[in-house]
């Protein structure tokens, strides 16, 4: 039976609010003005506003007023091997609000062969009963057939879902073949949906995991050793290539390495419609912790793709986030207790994957990118809120301070300093991967649906008051270019006369013949040069190898200072 929505859940009674003396910061401009809110919407913006009586006034005192944050990647109340993450939809959204995030987009993960629609309705029921901020849902495609196609189409047209994630990893569970990826991307492009991808080479990971265990490496360090960044980069390159062939917009989740960031950056410079999503963990910390002598600490960092062991990676990713090469940020918040993580104490492949970050996301970005001078305040709003709203067709209802937009606002103090601690955070997780980190920038007041949710460090939240926000297909921000390319990319056969020459008679050839050059015996001399089909000059930068007719000399790939060389390149 289809889930019918909320029943007898307390609703927020929206307050009439007036924010005075604030500096409004959108993604494209900043200016001083007052803001009047009523019935959960922004009604007036300007100076000397005429407002009705009974209005609660908040003095911003020149502080920034920004759109509420949108966390585009969460895993709240996620089932895993008979367990559930410790942060359910109430605890998780409570932590989100404490950090300045007023909307989340969670992932629905159906079991393999299970109904996508039934899983979606299960997540709706869980979330409607517990969230205290607004939310939307991505749906993960964990298998592919004609029945799934019908469900995907119904979710887009009837249920308010416009984004679906596929997996290139987790062999024999969720992993899809290249053919399936091609079919999924083609289908989603026709529906006006966004194809999200978890990019890792699952086949090689499975082999490397076995190799590590055979070597006796069973701890968390085995996780990152079996998933080198080349395997993330290769999958990103492959996903970009397949999405390009199908003219489908691509959204790469959990961008964790320099190599992957570079590939996305180069693809965008060549005009490919691809978006990259770093997460709180990859922006704020690194993978050196996998070698901690404290098993529980090392296990707390286990997530996939793994954090890079190169300690310069977070700074690099922040730089490309600031430059616009990466567009959105999520937290991939999936918290397990130490006892839950410990089911993999003797085998790293069994450690539940996930880190915290829903509460810390906005402060980490401010501290690492804005306070360091990499990013201005407008770009901060873009990557924490506005771009997400545009990509998922929520703009300008979300991600903007404008008349008619939802009154989801944050008064932000750029000078506030907060020391992260599991003792004071609002997550139920007993360990925080940012423990002891001193972060500049924090919310002073958080307003969601026109109601004050946090003030003076105190939360005022009610379970079950969050709303499901449907996302419609064909967002302009994503699909305007796709539509233009579809018109330009019509293929036509070459008009020519019928061939009336001789045709070779295949019936006269030996049926058991072996193609030349493929026998398994001793190597023989080639009378003419034969192209190695495994050596391709293809590049998304547009350069084709051997254009001059001269074979390229073999090259040795040398690791540059600071890290390994990429196995794939878009330049």
UniProtKB/Swiss-Prot annotation:
Keywords: Cell projection, Cytoplasm. CDD domains: D-HYD (cd01314). Its main location: cytoplasm. Residues 516-529 have a biased composition (Polar residues). Necessary for signaling by class 3 semaphorins and subsequent remodeling of the cytoskeleton. Plays a role in axon guidance, neuronal growth cone collapse and cell migration. Belongs to the metallo-dependent hydrolases superfamily. Hydantoinase/dihydropyrimidinase family. This is Dihydropyrimidinase-related protein 3. It comes from Xenopus tropicalis.
């Amino acid at each position: 039976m289809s889930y019918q929505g909320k029943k007898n859940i307390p609703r927020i009674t929206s307050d009439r609010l007036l924010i005075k003396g604030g500096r409004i910061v959108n993604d494209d401009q900043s200016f001083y003005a007052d803001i009047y809110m009523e019935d959960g919407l922004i009604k007036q913006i300007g100076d000397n506003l005429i407002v009705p009586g009974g209005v609660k006034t908040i003095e911003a005192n020149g502080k920034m007023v920004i759109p509420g944050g949108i966390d585009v990647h969460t895993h709240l109340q996620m089932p895993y091997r008979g367990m559930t993450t410790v942060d359910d939809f109430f605890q998780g959204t409570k932590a989100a609000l404490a950090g300045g995030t007023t909307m989340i987009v969670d992932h629905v993960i159906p079991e393999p062969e299970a109904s996508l629609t039934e899983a979606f309705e299960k997540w709706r029921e869980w979330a409607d009963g517990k969230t205290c901020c607004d939310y939307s849902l991505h749906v993960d495609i964990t298998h592919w057939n004609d029945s799934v196609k019908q469900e995907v189409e119904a979710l887009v047209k009837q249920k308010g879902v416009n984004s679906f994630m596929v997996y290139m990893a987790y062999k024999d569970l969720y992993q899809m073949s290249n053919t399936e990826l091609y079919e999924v991307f083609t289908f989603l492009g026709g529906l006006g949906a966004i194809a999200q991808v978890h990019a890792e080479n699952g086949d090689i990971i499975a082999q490397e995991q076995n190799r590590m265990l055979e070597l006796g490496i069973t701890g968390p360090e085995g996780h990152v050793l079996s998933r080198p960044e080349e395997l993330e980069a290769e999958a990103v390159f492959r996903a970009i290539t397949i999405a390009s062939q199908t003219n489908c917009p691509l959204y790469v989740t959990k961008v964790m390495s320099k190599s992957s960031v570079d590939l996305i950056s180069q693809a965008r410079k060549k005009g490919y419609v691809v978006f990259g999503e770093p997460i709180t963990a990859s922006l704020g910390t690194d993978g050196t912790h996998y070698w901690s002598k404290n098993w529980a600490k090392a296990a707390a960092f286990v997530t996939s793709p793994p954090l890079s062991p190169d300690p310069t990676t977070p700074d690099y990713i922040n730089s490309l986030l600031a430059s616009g090469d990466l567009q959105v940020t999520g937290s991939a918040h999936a918290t397990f207790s130490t006892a839950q993580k410990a089911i993999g104490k003797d085998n790293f492949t069994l450690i539940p994957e996930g880190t915290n970050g829903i509460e810390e996301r906005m402060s980490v970005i401010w501290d690492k990118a804005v306070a360091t001078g990499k990013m201005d305040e407008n770009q901060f709003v873009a990557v924490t809120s506005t771009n997400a709203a545009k990509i998922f067709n929520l703009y300008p209802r979300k991600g903007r301070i404008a008349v008619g937009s939802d009154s989801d606002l944050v008064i932000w103090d750029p000078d506030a300093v907060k020391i992260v601690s599991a003792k004071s955070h609002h997550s139920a997780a007993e360990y925080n991967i940012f423990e002891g980190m001193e972060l500049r920038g924090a919310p002073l007041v958080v307003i969601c649906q026109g109601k004050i949710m946090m003030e003076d460090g105190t939360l005022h939240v009610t379970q079950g008051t969050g709303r499901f926000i449907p996302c419609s297909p064909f967002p302009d921000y994503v699909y305007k270019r796709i539509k233009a390319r579809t018109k330009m990319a019509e293929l036509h056969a070459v008009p020519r006369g019928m061939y009336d020459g001789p045709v070779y008679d295949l019936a006269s050839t030996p049926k058991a013949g072996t193609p030349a050059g493929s026998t398994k015996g001793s190597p023989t001399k080639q009378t003419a040069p034969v192209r190695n089909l495994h050596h391709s000059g293809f590049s998304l930068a547009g350069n084709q190898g051997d254009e001059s007719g001269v074979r390229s000399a073999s090259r040795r790939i040398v690791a540059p200072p600071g890290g390994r060389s990429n196995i794939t390149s878009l330049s």
